[in-house]
Amino acid sequence: ALSRSAVSDVQIESLEVRSGQCPGPLYLHTSPEFMMKRMLADSWPDIYSISRVFRDDEWGPRHQPEFTLLEWYRLDFGLGDIVDDAVRLIATALVVDYRDAFLSVLALDPASASIRDMSAAANADADLVAAIGTERDDWLDLMMSTRIAPQFAKDCLTVVRHYPASQAALARTCPVDASVADRFEVFIGDMELGNGYVELTDAEEQS
């Protein structure tokens, strides 16, 4: 599918294409998410899609710019229901909060750790510190991918839930703790298999 607009998630790069029949750039869809949300807004029931999607800057032994994505939506499901739904598709899983994973592996609280603390935990040299700068979420992503996820069991799933609100993407913040998002990711070993969240439907919060 082609769109005149790129995806709004800052963590995802849209693949740009051009057509002689259309002024300006077009973008291949990164997921069927926005079309499916239109269907939900039009009162469709539970829905799913299995489709080819495209993402730029996703090239390596674990990522390709084109891949097949399963995406589904359940009405009136909370975060726990969505986690159970995802896990039942694959296998049994260990569920851990994002903050607890950091505390367990690094003895760092992701909500309060300083950039200095995180760079020390990453054994970051001066070049890496300069490259990442002072963006907290970039440091947290580095910690997750290089220090925490490699500790996950390789023979079962690990579900990490309640990511920081700054990494909510299109998820709502947790009703009982606004510092975290109702969002999760599923890993086997250190490889992410999927993710999910409770939709943000509050227009004021989304703005």
Residue ranges and their predicted role:
Residues 96-100:
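C-terminal domain-boundary segment and adjacent tail
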